[in-house]
């Protein structure tokens, strides 16, 4: 897996967590 892709997934997960929280 590309590092950039992992960073992107991490950012998306943080956004989802902040929105659903």
Curated annotation (Swiss-Prot):
Possible increased expression of this protein (due to mutations upstream of the start codon) is proposed to be responsible for resistance to 3-hydroxypropionic acid (3-HP). Mutagenesis of the start codon from ATG to TTG, which should decrease protein expression, results in loss of 3-HP resistance. This is Protein IroK. It comes from Escherichia coli (strain K12).
